[in-house]
Regions:
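Short, glycine/charged-enriched hinge/interface segments at domain edges or termini
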Residues: 2-4, 54-138
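Short, low-complexity N-terminal leaders and the immediately following helix N-cap/first helix
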Residues: 1-63, 115, 131
Length: 139
């Protein structure tokens, strides 16, 4: 039996080191990166909604609860003020989560009223929020 160091030495003697080359992205199929890819920013750059619905405080997600709708936020826009308890903001997929909100109530789980929304008796408990940097982080 040989030692670990001897076995490692034998294995490393079989390794062929190769140079790297720069190629266009179109020519990179089935190739391996020679250096790490480093991002200059987080993606997404802020918490975003994963579904169409209403941005709310998680504590407000209670069956049959009425919430006022105080505005709307779409992808590429923002909502100026913070959400308070008992309030919601109409939100669409990819839109930034308004300040004060930490969950999305999907639209299928609500009943639209003139004065706001009511949460259905049975509703999805998930938050439906894509956290800042969940795809990749800077660095």
């Amino acid at each position: 039996m040989i030692s670990f160091e001897q076995a490692l030495s034998k294995l490393l003697s079989l390794v062929e080191y190769i140079d790297f080359e720069e190629v266009k992205l179109e020519e990179a199929h089935c190739r391996v990166l020679a250096v790490d890819a480093i991002s200059s920013r987080d993606q997404p750059p802020f918490d975003t909604s994963a579904m169409d619905g209403y941005a709310v405080k998680k504590i407000d997600k209670v069956p049959n609860k009425n919430l006022s709708v105080i505005g709307k936020v779409t992808a590429g826009s923002s909502f100026a003020r913070s959400i308070n308890k008992g309030e919601s903001v109409r939100i669409f997929t990819g839109a930034p989560m308004p300040k004060g909100s930490n969950s999305v109530l999907i639209q299928e789980d609500t009943i639209q009223l003139e004065s706001g929304i009511t949460i259905r008796e049975k509703f999805e408990k998930k938050d439906f929020v894509r956290k800042k940097g969940c795809d990749y982080k800077a660095g």
